[in-house]
């Protein structure tokens, strides 16, 4: 451990009462946020077990760390534990949750456990509708490069670390703050970042945008009076809220009045170059290994946080230049040689119209000569309904669109808010002819017919489409399957 990293005691030393807790159980342990907290706790020395409905890369990693993993939920699995951790995705009638309450076992929400981890640390909490995972990852990478040895909990795989969570030995904890269920109000960080604010997860906020705005202001007011709010002034709602924030504020963005400002933006392929201007400091000439203006904004947030903490410019420059990306955030899967020619496959998690638009813009800037083919999987019927016209507009911007069924995420279908309806509306708009694909088998038949030499193929969405991108890579984008089918014909 670096001599720059202040040795920090474990949770049970920071909070002596936590010594009473020996065995922690996670219901829904395979989620990225849940799995990250579980990984930190098992490395703190706690006995951990947990359940989920299916195996995943997260559950496999936790099992390797000694966590007992159950596939499926059963009341008997919680009988000998001291505390049960649940996410808001877990229904009230879950048998393990019901059993825990009957046995009078304390039940805490995921965000409450994260808040306990943050309570006696220097917390950096990253909130916002878009860009949380990338921004949190960039901050963690800068602090790591500066030998601050942070603990981090991220909603995606940090490629350089091979994990989405790590227990450091310093006082720093860098984590995503989840506004989807307003649970970020449990957190009491030292630094809060707000990347942007848009209408999403509106069921939580009773369809009231003003309530969403007020909740973000409340989140920032959880800062101590000596803390700092780092906010993106380019975002119109964030700019509107600044007069309501009663804490010290550092702004960032491309705007002329930003405290940390980007100039001279240029994207070449996957990376971006830009200049950073900060009041009273030398300009920074930077390159970040991420595409798109939106990722320059994410980088500015990390730079602002690091500058506040007096991290050396050299560490910032090196961390951004060497950044290896995050799983499913414009992740380059590979370049494939097929019967049609060379085709690049990229996988992206974005599932809100603004996120999809940013991804399309980054692809156009980085590879302007390539035709953009998107396989899109809508995520949740409610989001499709609430943002329907925005989806129609954004998805019409690609050259070729294949549409999968909606990934329900536990929701019941909503009439008029499904993939077939989206396809009809996009077709009427007249910019692109969408193709509805009912199954993976159909996709592997259709895709080789559509692809052309030089295409950039983008798999886009937050559901099971991430697994699809891997299977496409394994089948050479469906061309291997097509050859097999021809031989068997």
Swiss-Prot record:
<keyword id="KW-0133">Cell shape</keyword>
<dbReference type="GO" id="GO:0005737">
    <property type="term" value="C:cytoplasm"/>
</dbReference>
<dbReference type="InterPro" id="IPR050061">
    <property type="entry name" value="MurCDEF_pg_biosynth"/>
</dbReference>
<dbReference type="InterPro" id="IPR013221">
    <property type="entry name" value="Mur_ligase_cen"/>
</dbReference>
<keyword id="KW-0132">Cell division</keyword>
<dbReference type="Pfam" id="PF01225">
    <property type="entry name" value="Mur_ligase"/>
</dbReference>
<feature type="binding site">
    <location>
        <begin position="128"/>
        <end position="134"/>
    </location>
    <ligand>
        <name>ATP</name>
    </ligand>
</feature>
<keyword id="KW-0067">ATP-binding</keyword>
<keyword id="KW-0547">Nucleotide-binding</keyword>
<keyword id="KW-0963">Cytoplasm</keyword>
<dbReference type="GO" id="GO:0005524">
    <property type="term" value="F:ATP binding"/>
</dbReference>
<dbReference type="InterPro" id="IPR005758">
    <property type="entry name" value="UDP-N-AcMur_Ala_ligase_MurC"/>
</dbReference>
<comment type="similarity">
    <text>Belongs to the MurCDEF family.</text>
</comment>
<keyword id="KW-0436">Ligase</keyword>
<keyword id="KW-0573">Peptidoglycan synthesis</keyword>
<protein>
    <recommendedName>
        <fullName>UDP-N-acetylmuramate--L-alanine ligase</fullName>
        <ecNumber>6.3.2.8</ecNumber>
    </recommendedName>
</protein>
<dbReference type="InterPro" id="IPR000713">
    <property type="entry name" value="Mur_ligase_N"/>
</dbReference>
<dbReference type="Pfam" id="PF08245">
    <property type="entry name" value="Mur_ligase_M"/>
</dbReference>
<dbReference type="InterPro" id="IPR036615">
    <property type="entry name" value="Mur_ligase_C_dom_sf"/>
</dbReference>
<dbReference type="InterPro" id="IPR036565">
    <property type="entry name" value="Mur-like_cat_sf"/>
</dbReference>
<dbReference type="Pfam" id="PF02875">
    <property type="entry name" value="Mur_ligase_C"/>
</dbReference>
<comment type="function">
    <text>Cell wall formation.</text>
</comment>
<dbReference type="GO" id="GO:0008763">
    <property type="term" value="F:UDP-N-acetylmuramate-L-alanine ligase activity"/>
</dbReference>
<dbReference type="GO" id="GO:0009252">
    <property type="term" value="P:peptidoglycan biosynthetic process"/>
</dbReference>
<dbReference type="GO" id="GO:0051301">
    <property type="term" value="P:cell division"/>
</dbReference>
<dbReference type="GO" id="GO:0008360">
    <property type="term" value="P:regulation of cell shape"/>
</dbReference>
<dbReference type="InterPro" id="IPR004101">
    <property type="entry name" value="Mur_ligase_C"/>
</dbReference>
<keyword id="KW-0131">Cell cycle</keyword>
<dbReference type="GO" id="GO:0071555">
    <property type="term" value="P:cell wall organization"/>
</dbReference>
<comment type="pathway">
    <text>Cell wall biogenesis; peptidoglycan biosynthesis.</text>
</comment>
<keyword id="KW-0961">Cell wall biogenesis/degradation</keyword>
């Amino acid at each position: 451990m670096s001599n720059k990293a202040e040795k920090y005691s474990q949770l049970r030393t920071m909070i002596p009462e936590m010594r009473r807790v020996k065995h922690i159980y996670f219901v829904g342990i395979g989620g990225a946020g849940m799995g990250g907290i579980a990984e930190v706790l098992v490395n703190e020395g706690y006995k951990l077990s947990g359940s989920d409905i299916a195996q995943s890369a997260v559950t496999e990693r936790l099992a390797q760390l000694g966590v007992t993993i159950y596939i499926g939920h059963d009341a008997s699995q919680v009988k000998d534990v001291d505390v049960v951790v649940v996410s808001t995705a877990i229904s009230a009638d879950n048998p393990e949750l019901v059993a825990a309450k009957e046995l009078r076992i304390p039940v805490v929400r995921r965000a409450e456990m994260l808040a306990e981890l943050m309570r006696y640390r220097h917390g950096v909490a990253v909130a916002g509708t878009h860009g949380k995972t990338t921004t949190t990852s960039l901050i963690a990478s800068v602090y790591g490069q500066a030998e601050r040895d942070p603990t981090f909990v991220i909603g995606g795989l940090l490629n350089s670390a091979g994990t989405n969570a790590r227990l450091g030995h310093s006082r720093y904890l860098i984590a995503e703050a989840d506004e989807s269920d307003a649970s970020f109000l449990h957190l009491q960080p030292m630094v809060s970042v707000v990347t942007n604010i848009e209408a999403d997860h509106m069921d939580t906020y009773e369809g009231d945008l003003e309530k969403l705005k007020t909740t973000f202001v409340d989140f920032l007011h959880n800062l101590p009076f000596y803390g700092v709010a780092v906010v993106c002034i380019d975002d119109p709602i964030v700019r509107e809220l600044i007069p309501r924030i009663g804490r010290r504020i550092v702004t960032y963005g491309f705007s002329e009045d930003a405290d940390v400002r980007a100039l001279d933006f240029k994207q070449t392929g996957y990376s971006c170059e830009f200049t950073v201007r900060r009041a009273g400091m030398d300009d920074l000439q930077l390159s970040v290994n991420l595409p798109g203006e939106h990722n320059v904004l994410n980088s500015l947030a990390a730079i602002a946080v690091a500058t506040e903490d007096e991290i050396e410019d050299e560490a910032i420059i090196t961390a951004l230049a060497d950044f290896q990306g995050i799983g499913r955030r414009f992740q380059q899967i590979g370049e494939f040689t097929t019967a049609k020619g060379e085709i690049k496959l990229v996988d992206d998690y974005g599932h809100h119209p603004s996120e999809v638009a940013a991804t399309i813009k980054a692809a156009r800037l980085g590879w302007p000569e390539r035709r953009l083919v998107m396989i899109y999987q809508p995520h949740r019927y409610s989001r499709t309904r609430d943002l329907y016209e925005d989806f129609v507009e954004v998805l019409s911007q690609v050259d070729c669109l294949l549409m999968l069924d909606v990934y329900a995420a536990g929701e019941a279908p909503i009439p008029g808010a499904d993939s077939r309806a989206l396809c009809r509306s996009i077709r009427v708009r007249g910019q692109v002819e969408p193709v509805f694909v009912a199954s993976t088998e159909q996709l592997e038949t259709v895709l080789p017919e559509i692809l052309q030499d030089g295409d950039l193929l983008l798999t886009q969405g937050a559901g099971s489409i991430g697994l699809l991108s891997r299977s496409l890579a394994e089948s050479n984008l469906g061309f291997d399957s097509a050859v097999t089918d021809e031989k068997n014909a």
